[in-house]
Amino acid sequence: MKDFIRYTKKRNLSLNTIRTYESVLKHYEPVLDSWIKIRNKIINSNFKPRTIHLHKNVLLSFFEFKKLKRYLQNLKLLKLPQIEMKYFDVISKNNLYKKTDILDDDSLEIKKYKTIIRFLFETGIRAHELFFLESINNRLYVLGKGNKKRQIFFVKQTFEQLQKFYENLKGFETTKTLRLYIKKIIGKNFTPHSLRRSFATFMLIKGANPKTVMLQMGHANIQTTFSYLNLNEQTNRRIYNKIMYQNDAE
């Protein structure tokens, strides 16, 4: 198990993701020698469907790393309870811009975190990727999962503002402080991942090419990108009504 955790660290995964992998694998460590025991532990668990699917994904990654083909195949075929549709909190561009406008009486810390929050929304990058930005010939690159470098598009004015604080960013080891400021500036229901989800929702609903959004976010496949599209129930109903109740010309 330790060699797998070392592998996840080399892949440049976030600290929170690595901790999740560790926690899940420790939960299954006593039964990892038997597929039947693993299956029974999954099936008989009292976790919510979303947590069970998370466990499945972690175990799939672990089995793939260990080249346990039979375990991998059996787990892929294992039927799990369906995940209920869940509406996550996202923030609109206009609302985010209002909340991150820098005011004259803002402290230096508030100015810094308002800039970071706006940059995360405008780029859709993962919070920990902030520490791996590289500017080359007016192009911006980030080191993402699996140590894969990708080019990202950005708003020049926001990035120039961010550069004023960038040396301070280098000292962060976790995004815990960032989480606290996001809740303070935007609202208690928001997290760094909410900004990433908000970016995807905004871009896709405005008609952006899904592949462009996929590449910007560093996703390996388009299905993952579409899973970030999050419209609340009211928005879904408004879109449905607009389409269904419009008068089509014959």
Curated annotation (Swiss-Prot):
UniProt-listed GO biological process terms: cell division; chromosome segregation; DNA integration; DNA recombination
The UniProt record lists the keyword Cell cycle: yes
Active-site residues per Swiss-Prot or TrEMBL entry: R126, K145, H193, R196, H219, Y228 (o-(3'-phospho-dna)-tyrosine intermediate)
A GO term from the CC aspect: cytoplasm
InterPro entries in alphabetical order: CB, DNA_brk_join_enz, Integrase-like_cat_sf, Integrase_catalytic, Tyrosine_recombinase_XerCD
Keyword terms, alphabetized: Cell cycle, Cell division, Chromosome partition, Cytoplasm, DNA integration, DNA recombination, DNA-binding
Compartments where found: Cytoplasm
Keyword Ribosomal protein: no
Similarity comment: family membership: Belongs to the 'phage' integrase family.
Name by which UniProt lists this protein: Tyrosine recombinase UU222
Organism of provenance: Ureaplasma parvum serovar 3 (strain ATCC 700970)
